[in-house]
């Protein structure tokens, strides 16, 4: 299995973020942790055929025309998924139970976080088909390799 590449970009000035995007050769997804210059950043990412993921705000993802949203695990994921329509829903989970519940709610990918993130990702890929990634520690078995810009 070839790992996809999931890029995470911290908040920064518009020029800095756009410069980082310009240097990307290829990636599957781009999560921007900021809230400034979102339309311009989204357009630059999508122009490279990379999925633009909004952090923690489903309504904003819809408004911007993003490709998805990544949210922390919480009750009400089915409602978020229904509101998103075709947009991807990524859910940050730190336990097996959270991940299974997120999968049942329709998550398109699971992002494991916490000190056991890699261990949880290995467990997940052995049992489930929903893609996963490990935010906290690298995991070669996960569907996506995470790189911070």
PLM features: what roles do these ranges have?
Residues 1-75, 82-108, 130, 139-141:
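Conserved N-terminal beta1-alpha1 strand-loop-helix module at the mouth
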Residues 108-149:
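Active-site/ligand-binding-proximal alpha/beta "capping" segment
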């Amino acid at each position: 299995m070839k790992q996809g590449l999931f890029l995470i970009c911290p908040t920064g000035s518009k020029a800095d973020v756009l410069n980082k995007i310009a240097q990307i050769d290829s990636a599957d997804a781009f999560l921007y942790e900021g809230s400034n210059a979102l339309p311009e950043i989204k357009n630059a990412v999508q122009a490279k055929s990379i999925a633009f993921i909004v952090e923690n705000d489903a309504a904003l993802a819809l408004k911007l025309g993003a490709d998805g949203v990544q949210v922390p695990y919480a009750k009400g994921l089915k409602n978020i998924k229904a509101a998103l329509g075709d947009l991807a829903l990524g859910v940050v989970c730190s336990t097996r139970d959270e991940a299974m519940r997120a999968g049942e709610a329709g998550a398109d990918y699971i992002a494991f976080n916490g000190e056991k993130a890699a261990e949880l990702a290995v467990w997940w890929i052995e049992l489930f088909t929903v893609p996963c990634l490990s935010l906290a520690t690298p995991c070669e078995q996960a569907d996506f390799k995470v790189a911070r810009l």
